[in-house]
Amino acid sequence: MKKQTKIAAALSAAAFMMMVSGLPVYAASYGWVTEGDAKVYYDEDGYLTTDAWRKRGEDWFYLGEDGQIVKSKKIDEYYVDDEGKMVTNAWVELKNEEDPDSPETPDTFWYYFEKDGKSAVSKWVKFDSKWYYFDESGHMATGKTEIDGATYYLGTEKDGFMRTGWIRLEENSHAP
């Protein structure tokens, strides 16, 4: 009986070892990790960080719902470039995804992302000695525009800076 118990115990131990040896063992690590072709971030508790900003070196990156770095996308009032870095102190032209089929809206909108990475919103910005206005959506305003009760001419969709003095405008093709 003792011999059978020893054999059963040995077989059980061998079976247990075989089952356990197939399980992967992970080293405790946190911070930036490369998984395949993607960079991801694990917090101090070992959880994958999702839907959050994390800094690497001097640059900020946004991690999407899958934990991977988001690239070439506007995220709330910020924008990340094709490497996933938050854009700062830069102009960015983005495709109109708000109402792309409307003939009254442009195909693209211009944004200016300031030093903190946020897009300029409802404010004037001086850039290269020229003044630009950005509306409540962060779009560069163009054409004849009323701002705080005053009327301004802010150029075309491609240049958008405030004009002063006399301006000769092309005839409006929609005028009767």
Label the model's feature ranges.
Residues 2-176:
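Extracellular adhesion/carbohydrate-binding repeat motifs centered on closely spaced tryptophans
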